[in-house]
Amino acid sequence: VQRYMPELFETEFDHMKELADELAAHLIVRLAQNADLRDFGKHACARLDSFSREYPFIQYLYLTDTKGSLKCAAITDPAYREKYEALPIGFDFSQREWFKMPMQTGDMHIMDVYQSQFTGKLVITVSCPVTDDDDNIVGVIGVDIQLEQLLKRSQALQQEARAAED
């Protein structure tokens, strides 16, 4: 049956994507709750830098305001810095799915796996609204995560997620 109706069966790739989604979701939600992100200033940019250094599978980490204007970003691999710098501060992301969905729903959004135009690697983009103390959306944080690198670290990340829940 699987041979003739493969859509009815979960593939290894589907399983890997689910795992990646779960792990990435834990990380981005935790980061989005950080109060430093709300001011869009030097504290926000410093927090993005330190977070991306902590998780080297992050390819690109970025913060926008509610209009989709890029406020700060962290590029983890120096080899890609020049390519990503084509997206300057103030770049308009307002028409991108990863920005629009959290603004419309107020919830985290996970995109399907795709090939990065900057690195050629398979990535998933996870985005989440950043809210103030009254739960008003003040911005959106997004992260492009290299699928291969995330899966290599999956066991350690699962342990970290369980520890955070306790």
Per-region residue spans from a language model:
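Conserved phosphate-coordination/catalytic loops
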Residues: 38-42, 92-93
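Conserved beta-strands of PAS-like sensory domains
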Residues: 119-158
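Generic structural signal for secondary-structure transition and capping sites
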Residues: 28, 107-108
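Juxtamembrane extracytoplasmic/periplasmic/luminal helical "stalk" adjacent to the first N-terminal
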Residues: 1-37, 122, 148-166
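Amphipathic alpha-helical coiled-coil segments that mediate homodimerization
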Residues: 40-51
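Extracellular/periplasmic ligand-sensing ectodomains of membrane signal-transduction proteins
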Residues: 51-104, 113-118
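Short N-terminal helix-loop-first-beta-strand/juxtamembrane motif that initiates sensory/input modules
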Residues: 14, 18-21, 52-70, 108, ...
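Sensory input modules used in signal transduction
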Residues: 111-113, 127
